[in-house]
Amino acid sequence: MPSHSRSRDRYRGRDESEPERDRRHYSRRRYRETDYEDDELDDDDYDRRRRYRRDDVYRRSRGQSRGYESHEYHEDDANEYDLAGEDPAVPLRRSRGDERERSAGAYDDYDSPRRRDRHRDGDRRRRHRAYEAEGSPPRGAPDHRRHRSRDDRRERAYESEREARRHRRRERGREAAAAKHQSSDSTNSGSHLLSADALAKLRSEYDKEDRSRAKADAKAEKKQRRKRPVVADQPRRLDPFPEETPRGQSKGRIVSGAYLEEGRSPEMKVRHRGGGGGGGAGSKWRDEGASDSDMDGAEGGTPFWKKKKTWIAVGVVVVLLAIIIPVAVVVSKKNNEKKSDSTTDDTTPRNSNLDGISRDSIPDYAKGTVLDPWTWYDTMGFNVTFTNETVGGLSIMGLNSTWDDSTRPNDNVPPLNEPFPYGSQPIRGVNLGGWLSIEPFIVPSLFESYSSVDGVVDEWTLCQKLGDSAASRIERHYATFITEQDFADIRDAGLDHVRIQFSYWAVTTYDGDQYVPKISWRYLLRAIEYCRKYGLRVKLDPHGIPGSQNGWNHSGRQGPIGWLNGTDGQLNRKRSLEMHDQLSQFFAQDRYKNIVTIYGLVNEPMMLSLPVEDVLDWSTEATKLIQKNGITAYVTVHDGFLNLSKWKQMLKTRPDRMFLDTHQYTIFNTAQIVMKHTEKIKLVCNDWHSMIQQINTTSAGWGPTICGEWSQADTDCTKYLNNVGRGTRWEGTFSLTDSTAYCPTAKSGPSCSCSSANADPSQYSDQYKKFLKTYAEAQMSAFETAQGWFYWTWHTESAPQWSYKTAWKNGFMPQKAYAPDFKCGDDVPDFGDLPENY
């Protein structure tokens, strides 16, 4: 193993080998006997040694070449390795007196350095001939390695001596010139000498000559390293060009650890970007510290074989592009044709109807407001002609002045301009939840990027966190989450009603509110026009009213109830009535009489916490106000989560044309979520069927009743369903104090898991799809014994058991809502080996 170079300096004489000491002794003797002023002798010796190394050096393999440990020194560099073999007691330069004494004497021919060098070179040639005559020892044999190593050391010593002599010769010349300039002797007077500028120019020429010689030496050395012996008795040949290095294999070489530590291995390379002598088509590998002209190849250019590879690569790329580009164009055209066949493009804003409209048509006072169509994310389907007209204080901007109510969704339903036979024909509708009133479990993408530290759990905190970007981000959600295509699909699924959620900030906001104001209003109006286009009737549903009616995230703000309760309870009561005053004036227009056929007061007021009488009084007052303003639609009041049997005695003296709205789920009740698949279907067809049928009558119940929300979800596994960051009853992670899992196999096993319920619907088994479809059809059958139903909800990002659209397209919802395969009274089908914990 090579010795660490610094160790050789530090421990000289203790760990060096006998050949090393011989080399140092020989070097000292050479320093004493050499005439440092004999320039011609130095050059002759150097040239002779170069020829010797080139022509007669021992045959070595490439891996043993001395080039792996050799490196260039600049002639002016002071390097510790150059001095390693010298005796500190022997001065590098003799005094002037010694030099004059030596120059005065004459050398004997036998003792002259030239004679000794000739004898030494002759001895070496004779030794080489003797080795060749006897046959070279095997590669790696001990004596071969020892002789080669000793010669290598001596050759390196010669090179070091030559560099040192040249350095000292130059210094002596400079000192002599300086001494002459300083002399007062007329012989040495400055008037007989060159000027300082001339001397500087002369030194510059010397330096240039030295650099040129050093560069030539480096090039010769590099060429020497590329040679290798083939066999002992055959001439040398150039190494073949390197083959492609396998990927992952290092291109580096093993060198002295000291050299690597110093960063001075001759094979260490760095990569330079672009440029450089060969044309810069790609990055070039250069020796560290080398200039561009030192690259492989003549005069810094790229070798032919590399150029050939480059041209081949360029040709391949050109051929591939010639194939790929036409294919891409064809595919792009096909995709564009497919997109043009659809009614909407869900990903990009559609603003083509602004073409031909001048920005100057918008008054200065309206520019940059909700009345300025150039600020709208999506203008398709809107009338972008400016108007500041309002009805009930609410803008009609975006509406067309004409409409057509002759459409119907299917042949089972009368057109819009004919009355719908409520009471004799059931409603088959769907909700647009999570759209204009945002809910985390329906659109989790709006909430997933925040941590629990951010506290983003509802629309209030979302808008607060978004800050100035809230309006643009939320309008993009409005424009893309529900589009015209959704209304066409709702019609095609056999549905005939749509329950549209919106909140009070569509109408107005108050000091301190974080919500985005009024933008959702125009999307509500456009949605109604899309419903008109496809013959769908509308139920309006205020999901969030001032102060929050239940404190849940879908009311806008999760937390305490501030409506009819708390410090601002009465203020928010007044505000909510003002909201209905404006809304009822607007929707009492003739254009809405045939399409807005059901008008909701408030979604899910928490009557288990609020004073029941206060809620009933507000409901009566609001209904009278609405009807006074001209609303002829049915007005709905929610059951407030009270037992339906209690409603038999409530609001018995109420205004006409009112519906009771109830929401039925099995997953939020721990006694029902643990039921097995067949038991849940029997619960719906036996208990719910009779309950809904009874409450729908005025004699034994309350009167006309609809089911405004239900789903086919049989677990509460959906992300964020129980609030952001809350667990599930199904797996026992819902309660902070109770880890009981509520699923059919919780006690007997296997353990409950949400992985199956939350899987992609394409992975649902046929048995599970059969259950989900039967479970949905059973609920349809039960709710159709009253006024009908609205499924919750039409579209979700990732909750298939809550999305009518996903179920319909994946085969676990009837293809036509009016033509189910199962109804209560039929035999419950066998679900095979469907696991109960699925």
Curated annotation (Swiss-Prot):
Residues at the catalytic site: E604, E709
Alphabetically sorted, this entry's keywords are: Carbohydrate metabolism, Cell membrane, Cell wall biogenesis/degradation, Glycoprotein, Glycosidase, Hydrolase, Membrane, Polysaccharide degradation, Signal-anchor, Transmembrane, Transmembrane helix
For the region Disordered, what residue ranges are annotated?
Answer: 1-298, 335-359
- Which ranges of the sequence are coiled-coil? none
**Glycan-modified residues:** N383, N388, N400, N553, N565, N643, N696
Provide the transmembrane region boundaries: 311-331
Keyword Transmembrane helix applies: yes
Q: Tell me what gene encodes this.
A: exgD
- Provide the function of this protein: Glucosidase involved in the degradation of cellulosic biomass. Active on lichenan.
Q: Name one GO cellular component term.
A: extracellular region
Residue ranges with Basic and acidic residues bias: 1-23, 111-124, 149-164, 200-221, 234-246
Q: Which residues lie on this side of the membrane: Extracellular?
A: 332-838
Give GO BP annotations, semicolon-separated. Answer: cell wall organization; glucan catabolic process
Q: Which top-level group of life is the source organism from? A: Eukaryota
**Record family assignment:** Belongs to the glycosyl hydrolase 5 (cellulase A) family.
Chief location: membrane
- Enzyme class label: hydrolase
Acidic residues bias located where?
A: 35-45
- Give residue spans on the Cytoplasmic membrane side: 1-310
Recorded catalytic activity of this chain's protein: Successive hydrolysis of beta-D-glucose units from the non-reducing ends of (1->3)-beta-D-glucans, releasing alpha-glucose
Organism phylogeny: Eukaryota, Fungi, Dikarya, Ascomycota, Pezizomycotina
Look up and give the membrane topology term.
Answer: Single-pass type II membrane protein
Q: Which GO terms describe its molecular function?
A: glucan exo-1,3-beta-glucosidase activity
> Which named protein is this?
Probable glucan 1,3-beta-glucosidase D
